[in-house]
Regions:
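Active-site neighborhoods and metal-handling regions in enzymes and metal-associated proteins
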Residues: 1-172
């Protein structure tokens, strides 16, 4: 497999796309609270991406071969939903855990990020799981360097999760 090294200009465009994705999460953060629906959060993000950023919400209508198009602009995974939850009219309530996953396209480059939100007070177990996941993410990121293998990243993440009695989702 040949790995093509991007040019400095391409890397700059990647950074811009990533910054825009992060800005969507910063924009939506004050709106994430009990009483709002994930559908409303999606609508706010959609409008912000299109009208303020002039970015394209990558998930909207994305369909890999054999699948139905994704109907929303962001993914909202509530509580036990692992990933790629579809925003809907369910009202968020105190104690919910919500992950918002944002992917934007700007000048042909994708920026993809997510953030975990706690709605009000969540259980100690939910806080512990989120903390272990956060730590595992950084341990994986720390493995990224010239000559590293993808398996090194996965191993660091999996070893940390398993040391706390958790496992890593293999298929979703």
């Amino acid at each position: 497999m040949v790995i093509k090294i991007p040019s400095p200009e391409q890397i700059a465009k990647m950074r811009v796309a990533g910054k825009f994705a992060s800005e969507v999460l910063d924009f939506i953060t004050p709106h994430v609270k009990a009483g709002i629906t994930t559908e409303a959060l999606d609508s706010l993000c959609h409008d912000y991406m299109l009208n303020t950023q002039q970015t394209i919400p990558a998930p909207l209508n994305y369909a890999p071969p054999g699948y139905h198009p994704f109907p929303k602009s962001i993914c909202t995974s509530v509580n036990n939903v692992i990933c790629h939850g579809i925003p809907n009219e369910k009202v968020l309530k105190d104690g919910d855990c919500l992950n918002i996953d944002v992917t934007v396209i700007k000048d042909g480059y994708h920026g993809d990020t997510s953030r975990m939100f706690f709605i009000g007070e969540v259980s100690v177990l939910a806080k512990r799981l989120a903390q272990v996941c956060y730590e595992a993410m950084w341990l994986g990121i720390d493995q990224i360097k010239p000559g590293a293998r993808l398996g090194d990243i996965g191993h660091a993440i999996q070893a940390h999760a398993e040391s706390f009695g958790y496992s890593v989702v293999r298929e979703f």
